[in-house]
Amino acid sequence: MRFAILSPIYPYRGGIAQFSGMLYTELVKEGHEVKAFNFKRLYPDILFPGKTQYVEAGDRAIEIESVRVLDSVNPVSYFSTVNAIRSYAPDVLIISYWMSFFVPGYAHVANRMKKHCKVITLIHNAIPHEPRFFDKPLASLLFKQCHGFIVMSDNVRYDLRKLYPGAKYIQNPHPLYNHFGSKINKNEACQKLGIHPSKKNLLFFGLIRDYKGLDLLIEAIGQLNEDYHLIIAGECYGSFEKYQALIDASPAKERIFVHCEYISDEEIPIYFLSLIHI
């Protein structure tokens, strides 16, 4: 079978790009013909709160060749994307969806392609973690252009059925990532982080966003005894100042270790192998 994947993928970094790279690889392993259609501009720089959108040294990225054609904020590229995918003539188009910002381009492509192939949307989030008033109507607009859906959690299935009651979908658990750095022992991991392996090390890992409750975790660690240490590892979208103020005021401030930066794929095992709980 011939698959087209429309998604951010290498050289973009982050979970969606990593997932799409793995999906591409596994479909090829199964003997399918696959082509990736990528963004030439994902987020305009003025709207992107992080350091960079692209892989850097230390990232164990799945290097997938792709056609970089879709520009999220340039409607002309929506037509170019349709033409590029149609010329490939796929049996199935898989669209990676996680936020409504991309609906205008995605919905246009899905609408134009649904007469030529099956259009399946793989939904990471039907409704964003920080929802806005326009997220639901935009998501519904896209979903109505699709033949079917893939969801990976009960919550996303629930959201999909509320937004599009007639949706045809399958649900499979989110697969494990297998492209990170080599495994090391706990003592070595703790040594690299400058923490003690005998302590009860807790980890907050990933992008730091308001909705994730890091402020509550910082307050909670101050109520635990000195055996508990907290590691905060991830890039902050927004200012870290309010979290730093909580740390400075905490009785546990000497037991809180901050790595406020994007953690490369190569470094990830160090953090996860140093702890008792996530």
Summary of predicted features, one role per range:
Residues 181-195, 245:
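A short helix/loop element that forms part of the nucleotide-sugar donor recognition site in Leloir-type
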